[in-house]
Amino acid sequence: MTSRDSAAAEITPEVLLRAYACGIFPMAESVDDPTLFWVEPELRGIIPLGGFRVASRLARTVRSDAFTVTVNRDFKGVIDGCAAPQPGRDDTWINRRIRELYIGLHGIGHCHSVEVWQDGDLAGGLYGVSLGRAFFGESMFHRARDASKVALVHLVARLLAGGYELLDTQFVTDHLRSFGAIEVPRQRYRSMLDDALQGIAAFDALPVDQPVTGAKALEIIAAH
Protein backbone atom coordinates (compact mmCIF):
# COMPACT_ATOMS: atom_id res chain seq x y z
CA MET A 1 0.00 0.00 0.00
CA THR A 2 1.33 3.44 -0.90
CA SER A 3 0.11 6.99 -0.57
CA ARG A 4 1.45 10.10 -2.25
CA ASP A 5 2.61 13.10 -0.28
CA SER A 6 2.70 16.29 -2.31
CA ALA A 7 3.71 18.39 0.69
CA ALA A 8 7.05 16.77 1.45
CA ALA A 9 8.23 19.93 3.20
CA GLU A 10 5.80 19.17 6.04
CA ILE A 11 7.54 15.91 6.89
CA THR A 12 9.99 16.36 9.76
CA PRO A 13 12.24 13.83 11.48
CA GLU A 14 9.70 13.68 14.31
CA VAL A 15 6.86 12.95 11.86
CA LEU A 16 9.06 10.29 10.31
CA LEU A 17 9.53 8.56 13.66
CA ARG A 18 5.77 8.50 14.22
CA ALA A 19 5.36 6.97 10.77
CA TYR A 20 7.85 4.21 11.58
CA ALA A 21 5.98 3.51 14.80
CA CYS A 22 2.88 2.94 12.65
CA GLY A 23 4.73 0.61 10.27
CA ILE A 24 5.09 2.94 7.28
CA PHE A 25 8.13 4.49 5.64
CA PRO A 26 8.80 7.00 2.85
CA MET A 27 10.33 6.49 -0.58
CA ALA A 28 10.81 8.52 -3.76
CA GLU A 29 10.46 7.35 -7.35
CA SER A 30 13.94 8.59 -8.25
CA VAL A 31 16.69 10.92 -7.15
CA ASP A 32 15.25 13.67 -9.37
CA ASP A 33 11.64 13.32 -8.18
CA PRO A 34 10.96 15.63 -5.19
CA THR A 35 7.74 13.81 -4.27
CA LEU A 36 7.72 11.33 -1.40
CA PHE A 37 5.22 8.54 -0.93
CA TRP A 38 4.41 6.37 2.05
CA VAL A 39 4.82 2.60 1.83
CA GLU A 40 3.29 -0.16 3.96
CA PRO A 41 3.93 -3.53 2.26
CA GLU A 42 1.38 -6.32 2.45
CA LEU A 43 4.30 -8.65 3.14
CA ARG A 44 7.05 -7.17 5.29
CA GLY A 45 10.66 -8.27 5.15
CA ILE A 46 12.38 -9.05 8.44
CA ILE A 47 15.47 -10.93 9.55
CA PRO A 48 14.72 -12.91 12.73
CA LEU A 49 17.71 -11.98 14.86
CA GLY A 50 17.93 -15.41 16.45
CA GLY A 51 17.98 -17.04 13.03
CA PHE A 52 20.62 -14.88 11.35
CA ARG A 53 22.84 -17.00 9.10
CA VAL A 54 26.46 -16.32 8.16
CA ALA A 55 27.92 -18.47 5.38
CA SER A 56 31.27 -20.06 6.16
CA ARG A 57 33.16 -18.09 3.49
CA LEU A 58 31.72 -14.81 4.76
CA ALA A 59 32.54 -15.80 8.34
CA ARG A 60 36.18 -16.22 7.33
CA THR A 61 36.15 -12.76 5.77
CA VAL A 62 34.57 -11.23 8.88
CA ARG A 63 36.99 -13.01 11.20
CA SER A 64 40.01 -11.92 9.16
CA ASP A 65 39.32 -8.23 9.85
CA ALA A 66 40.38 -7.43 6.30
CA PHE A 67 37.97 -4.52 6.68
CA THR A 68 37.78 -2.03 9.53
CA VAL A 69 34.21 -1.53 10.74
CA THR A 70 33.05 1.64 12.48
CA VAL A 71 29.73 3.08 13.63
CA ASN A 72 28.35 6.58 13.04
CA ARG A 73 31.70 7.85 11.82
CA ASP A 74 30.61 8.92 8.32
CA PHE A 75 26.82 8.90 8.13
CA LYS A 76 26.68 11.27 5.16
CA GLY A 77 29.24 9.19 3.30
CA VAL A 78 27.15 6.08 3.81
CA ILE A 79 23.85 7.60 2.70
CA ASP A 80 25.57 9.10 -0.33
CA GLY A 81 27.08 5.71 -1.12
CA CYS A 82 23.64 4.12 -0.88
CA ALA A 83 22.22 6.80 -3.19
CA ALA A 84 24.89 6.34 -5.87
CA PRO A 85 24.29 4.03 -8.88
CA GLN A 86 25.61 0.50 -8.44
CA PRO A 87 25.89 -2.54 -10.71
CA GLY A 88 22.35 -3.66 -11.46
CA ARG A 89 20.88 -0.49 -9.97
CA ASP A 90 21.07 2.61 -12.14
CA ASP A 91 18.64 4.73 -10.16
CA THR A 92 17.89 5.32 -6.51
CA TRP A 93 14.90 6.11 -4.30
CA ILE A 94 17.07 8.37 -2.12
CA ASN A 95 16.35 11.91 -3.25
CA ARG A 96 17.50 15.17 -1.63
CA ARG A 97 14.55 15.29 0.77
CA ILE A 98 15.07 11.68 1.90
CA ARG A 99 18.73 12.47 2.50
CA GLU A 100 17.88 15.55 4.58
CA LEU A 101 15.30 13.70 6.67
CA TYR A 102 17.60 10.83 7.59
CA ILE A 103 20.50 13.13 8.33
CA GLY A 104 18.06 14.89 10.66
CA LEU A 105 17.16 11.58 12.32
CA HIS A 106 20.85 10.84 12.72
CA GLY A 107 21.28 14.20 14.40
CA ILE A 108 18.71 13.34 17.08
CA GLY A 109 20.13 9.86 17.68
CA HIS A 110 17.53 7.75 15.87
CA CYS A 111 19.44 6.86 12.70
CA HIS A 112 22.76 5.05 12.64
CA SER A 113 25.36 4.04 10.10
CA VAL A 114 27.80 1.16 9.93
CA GLU A 115 30.86 1.93 7.84
CA VAL A 116 33.26 -0.59 6.32
CA TRP A 117 36.71 0.70 5.45
CA GLN A 118 39.49 -0.73 3.32
CA ASP A 119 42.90 0.95 3.31
CA GLY A 120 41.32 4.14 4.63
CA ASP A 121 38.61 4.32 1.97
CA LEU A 122 34.88 3.80 2.54
CA ALA A 123 34.28 0.42 0.92
CA GLY A 124 30.67 -0.12 1.96
CA GLY A 125 28.12 0.29 4.68
CA LEU A 126 24.50 0.59 5.68
CA TYR A 127 22.19 2.85 7.63
CA GLY A 128 18.89 2.49 9.39
CA VAL A 129 16.46 3.83 11.96
CA SER A 130 16.39 2.82 15.62
CA LEU A 131 13.17 3.07 17.61
CA GLY A 132 12.52 1.18 20.83
CA ARG A 133 13.82 -2.34 20.31
CA ALA A 134 13.26 -2.19 16.54
CA PHE A 135 15.83 -1.40 13.89
CA PHE A 136 14.68 -0.54 10.38
CA GLY A 137 17.36 -1.22 7.79
CA GLU A 138 17.11 1.40 5.06
CA SER A 139 19.83 0.77 2.50
CA MET A 140 23.31 -0.64 2.03
CA PHE A 141 26.06 -0.35 -0.55
CA HIS A 142 29.43 -1.78 -1.40
CA ARG A 143 32.47 -0.74 -3.42
CA ALA A 144 34.46 -3.83 -2.50
CA ARG A 145 33.37 -7.45 -2.47
CA ASP A 146 31.55 -8.47 0.72
CA ALA A 147 31.76 -4.99 2.26
CA SER A 148 27.99 -4.58 2.70
CA LYS A 149 27.71 -8.16 3.97
CA VAL A 150 30.35 -7.47 6.60
CA ALA A 151 28.41 -4.35 7.62
CA LEU A 152 25.25 -6.43 8.07
CA VAL A 153 27.04 -9.02 10.21
CA HIS A 154 28.38 -6.29 12.49
CA LEU A 155 24.96 -4.63 12.63
CA VAL A 156 23.26 -7.84 13.73
CA ALA A 157 25.90 -8.44 16.41
CA ARG A 158 25.30 -4.92 17.71
CA LEU A 159 21.52 -5.37 17.71
CA LEU A 160 21.79 -8.65 19.60
CA ALA A 161 24.16 -7.14 22.15
CA GLY A 162 21.87 -4.15 22.60
CA GLY A 163 18.65 -6.05 23.25
CA TYR A 164 16.86 -5.40 19.96
CA GLU A 165 13.98 -7.70 19.02
CA LEU A 166 13.10 -6.71 15.45
CA LEU A 167 15.24 -6.16 12.36
CA ASP A 168 12.97 -4.80 9.64
CA THR A 169 14.36 -5.04 6.10
CA GLN A 170 11.15 -3.66 4.54
CA PHE A 171 11.42 -6.02 1.56
CA VAL A 172 13.16 -9.35 0.95
CA THR A 173 15.74 -9.92 -1.77
CA ASP A 174 17.65 -13.09 -2.62
CA HIS A 175 20.67 -11.46 -1.03
CA LEU A 176 18.84 -10.90 2.27
CA ARG A 177 17.19 -14.31 2.11
CA SER A 178 20.64 -15.90 2.28
CA PHE A 179 20.99 -14.36 5.75
CA GLY A 180 17.65 -15.74 6.90
CA ALA A 181 15.27 -12.96 5.84
CA ILE A 182 11.59 -13.89 5.63
CA GLU A 183 8.32 -12.18 4.75
CA VAL A 184 5.54 -11.78 7.31
CA PRO A 185 1.96 -10.59 6.70
CA ARG A 186 1.15 -7.01 7.60
CA GLN A 187 -0.94 -7.83 10.67
CA ARG A 188 1.71 -10.12 12.11
CA TYR A 189 4.34 -7.48 11.45
CA ARG A 190 2.29 -4.83 13.26
CA SER A 191 2.06 -7.10 16.29
CA MET A 192 5.82 -7.70 16.24
CA LEU A 193 6.44 -3.97 15.87
CA ASP A 194 4.12 -3.10 18.75
CA ASP A 195 5.99 -5.52 21.00
CA ALA A 196 9.38 -4.15 19.94
CA LEU A 197 8.31 -0.56 20.61
CA GLN A 198 7.46 -1.32 24.23
CA GLY A 199 11.08 -1.49 25.38
CA ILE A 200 14.37 0.32 25.00
CA ALA A 201 17.45 -1.06 23.27
CA ALA A 202 21.02 0.22 23.30
CA PHE A 203 22.72 0.66 19.94
CA ASP A 204 25.87 1.57 21.85
CA ALA A 205 25.96 -1.64 23.90
CA LEU A 206 29.12 -2.38 21.92
CA PRO A 207 31.77 0.35 21.64
CA VAL A 208 31.03 3.09 19.13
CA ASP A 209 34.33 4.92 19.51
CA GLN A 210 36.53 2.01 18.46
CA PRO A 211 36.17 -0.90 16.01
CA VAL A 212 34.68 -4.21 17.14
CA THR A 213 36.60 -7.22 15.85
CA GLY A 214 35.01 -9.68 13.49
CA ALA A 215 35.66 -12.50 15.93
CA LYS A 216 33.70 -10.65 18.61
CA ALA A 217 30.79 -9.99 16.24
CA LEU A 218 30.62 -13.67 15.26
CA GLU A 219 30.85 -14.74 18.90
CA ILE A 220 27.82 -12.63 19.79
CA ILE A 221 25.81 -14.01 16.87
CA ALA A 222 26.74 -17.61 17.71
CA ALA A 223 25.62 -17.10 21.32
CA HIS A 224 22.09 -16.35 20.14
Curated annotation (Swiss-Prot):
InterPro entries in the record: Acyl_CoA_acyltransferase (IPR016181), Leu/Phe-tRNA_Trfase (IPR004616), Leu/Phe-tRNA_Trfase_C (IPR042203), Leu/Phe-tRNA_Trfase_N (IPR042221)
Catalytic activity: N-terminal L-lysyl-[protein] + L-leucyl-tRNA(Leu) = N-terminal L-leucyl-L-lysyl-[protein] + tRNA(Leu) + H(+); N-terminal L-arginyl-[protein] + L-leucyl-tRNA(Leu) = N-terminal L-leucyl-L-arginyl-[protein] + tRNA(Leu) + H(+); L-phenylalanyl-tRNA(Phe) + an N-terminal L-alpha-aminoacyl-[protein] = an N-terminal L-phenylalanyl-L-alpha-aminoacyl-[protein] + tRNA(Phe)
Localization: Cytoplasm
UniProt GO MF annotations: leucyl-tRNA--protein transferase activity
Entry-linked Gene3D superfamilies: Leucyl/phenylalanyl-tRNA-protein transferase, C-terminal domain (3.40.630.70), Leucyl/phenylalanyl-tRNA-protein transferase, N-terminal domain (3.30.70.3550)
One Pfam assignment: Leu_Phe_trans
One GO CC term on file: cytoplasm
Keywords tagged on the record: Acyltransferase, Cytoplasm, Transferase
An example Gene Ontology biological process: protein catabolic process
EC number(s) on file: 2.3.2.6
Superkingdom of origin: Bacteria
Function as written in the Swiss-Prot or TrEMBL entry: Functions in the N-end rule pathway of protein degradation where it conjugates Leu, Phe and, less efficiently, Met from aminoacyl-tRNAs to the N-termini of proteins containing an N-terminal arginine or lysine.
Family label: Belongs to the L/F-transferase family.
PANTHER family: LEUCYL/PHENYLALANYL-TRNA--PROTEIN TRANSFERASE (PTHR30098), LEUCYL_PHENYLALANYL-TRNA--PROTEIN TRANSFERASE (PTHR30098:SF2)
HAMAP family xref list: Leu_Phe_trans (MF_00688)
Protein name as catalogued: Leucyl/phenylalanyl-tRNA--protein transferase
Species in which this protein is naturally found: Rhodopseudomonas palustris (strain HaA2)
Lineage start: Bacteria, Pseudomonadati, Pseudomonadota, Alphaproteobacteria, Hyphomicrobiales
